[in-house]
Swiss-Prot record:
Belongs to the class-I aminoacyl-tRNA synthetase family. Glutamate--tRNA ligase type 1 subfamily. One of its GO terms (biological process) is glutamyl-tRNA aminoacylation. GO terms for molecular function: ATP binding; glutamate-tRNA ligase activity; tRNA binding; zinc ion binding. This is Glutamate--tRNA ligase. Coiled coil: none annotated. Monomer. The gene is gltX. The lineage of its organism: Bacteria, Pseudomonadati, Pseudomonadota, Betaproteobacteria, Burkholderiales. One of its GO terms (cellular component) is cytosol. Catalyzes the attachment of glutamate to tRNA(Glu) in a two-step reaction: glutamate is first activated by ATP to form Glu-AMP and then transferred to the acceptor end of tRNA(Glu). Its EC number is 6.1.1.17. It is found in: Cytoplasm.
Length: 465
């Protein structure tokens, strides 16, 4: 029987979560969904000084917005301390680990001497028990660390699903501290215990974890566990070619929501940020899950391109359901001071959305319907509301008032009749109408705008001429 696929996302809640971070959730989520497996969320919160509840909330909020549903969790490492201590003791009992009494000062001096000799700084195994080796008495009053007995000689080898075969000599690895003097376990040890207990089969994570992998594999093997498949994703770079980070100006995932991006656009963009399916650029979440595999993960760093994300967002806005878009855009309109009353918002969205890259831009255009009475610039009024044009405006108002149906086509016909009667070009009449009705010179098609404003509002505002 084939083993059930189990993947995990294991963020540290020490800051906000950006696109590069959330990609390490999206890919294992998609792989688990494609393989009919399980996706687990684990919060690695052992860095007590830097971990915050706010950061945990942001992780959960970001995943909820993108609808990256989990099958198990969230599990918190701080709630599993007893389990880690239990395994540390098992390793001590089975002589897989040992107590090391070397002080910080002694370790610093050792490393300094190694550097001076041109050697790689590392622990020298002084307190490591070996057959025939006589250890000194433990110094009084010193709380030891616990070190893992890393294999001596040989290599750690694994076939990374992204990077290919990787081989690290065990001579490059010293005996890792797995528990501090106060008994708290260290990061690499907790990760191994969690992955074994949670039966993780595939570890899909950023390539900043490659250096941790040989140590984790050695501990897994010492504990008799099965080594998972590792897939280390290349770094995501910002526009300047630097590693994406808060320090280098990266937005948190929730920041894209707040700027008016749609989750489906962000996911589509993330899908292509290090993975490809032929030349396909636009595809749904369901298509991505169907197509996703580890074989087509990119090996080179992926660079963030805001123009590409904006293009995708524009696509999803254009094809999006107008009722849903109206619900999502309403808060942006209200944030601009608009009152959504009068013109039907769903119809307004349908009219204005096609050129918008974000819901914020949709809201900014839609504001012409919801900002209240128009306050046109006096200079513009003087330029466009001339004595010459007023008779045509009055004739248009008469035509509009007599329309049997307030429909765009009928409004357009009324304009054409007045233009023909007065020998005018469309801009000569449309500009003052825009100023009077909308308070601005730039709007979508004037007949569509007037239809949405409604007959009463249009006639009342034209009367101000």
């Amino acid at each position: 029987m084939t083993q059930r696929v189990r993947t995990r996302f294991a963020p540290s809640p020490t800051g906000f979560i950006h696109l590069g971070n959330i990609r390490s959730a999206f890919y294992p989520w998609a792989f688990a969904r494609r393989m009919k497996g399980d996706f687990i969320l684990r919060i690695e919160d052992t860095d007590v000084e830097r971990s915050t509840d706010v950061a945990v909330d942001v992780i959960l909020e970001s995943m909820a917005w993108l609808d990256l549903d989990i099958d198990e969790g969230p599990f918190y490492q701080m709630q599993r301390m007893d389990r880690y201590r239990e395994v540390v003791q098992q390793m001590l009992d089975n002589e897989l680990a040992y107590h090391c009494y070397m002080s910080t000062e002694e370790l610093d001096a050792l490393r300094e001497a190694q550097r001076a000799a041109g050697e790689k700084p590392r622990y020298n195994g002084f307190w490591r028990p070996e057959p025939g080796k006589v250890l000194p008495e433990p110094p009084a009053g010193v709380q030891p660390v616990v070190r893992f007995k890393n294999p001596i000689g040989g290599s750690v080898v694994w076939d990374d699903a992204v990077k290919g075969r990787i081989e690290i000599s065990n001579d490059e690895l010293d005996d890792l501290v797995i528990a501090r003097p106060d008994g708290t376990p260290t990061y690499n040890f907790c990760v191994v215990v969690d992955d074994l207990d949670m039966k993780i089969t595939h570890v899909i994570r950023g390539d900043d974890h490659v250096n941790n992998t040989p140590r984790q594999i050695n501990i897994i093997r010492a504990l008799g566990g099965e080594v998972p498949v590792y897939a280390h994703l290349p770094t995501v770079l910002n526009e300047q070619g630097e590693k994406m980070s808060k320090r280098h100006g990266a937005l948190p995932v929730t920041g894209y929501r707040d700027e008016g991006y749609l989750p489906e656009a962000v996911l589509n963009y993330l899908a292509r940020l290090g993975w490809a399916h032929g030349d396909a650029e636009i595809f749904s979440r369901e298509q991505f899950v169907e197509w996703f595999d580890l074989e087509h993960l990119g090996k080179s760093p992926a660079q963030y391109n805001p123009e590409k994300l904006a293009w995708l967002n524009n696509h999803y806005i254009k094809v999006g359901d107008n009722t849903r878009l109206a619900d999502l855009t309403r808060p942006f309109i209200e944030a601009l001071g608009g009152k959504v009353e009068g013109a039907n918002l769903v119809d307004v969205i349908a009219l204005v959305k096609d050129r918008a890259n974000t819901l914020k831009e949709v809201a900014q255009t839609a504001m012409l319907f919801y900002r209240g009475e128009p306050q046109a610039d006096a200079a513009l009024k003087a330029e466009h509301l001339t004595d010459e044009i007023r008779p045509a405006l009055q004739a248009l108002a008469t035509q509009l008032a007599a329309l049997p149906e307030w429909k765009r086509e009928a409004i357009s016909a009324a304009f054409k009749a007045v233009l023909a009667e007065f020998g005018l070009k469309m801009p000569k009449l449309a500009m003052p109408v825009r100023l009077l009705v909308a308070g601005q010179l730039q709007t979508p098609s004037i007949d569509a705008v007037l239809e949405l404003f409604g007959r009463d509002t249009v006639l009342r505002r034209l009367a101000a001429a």
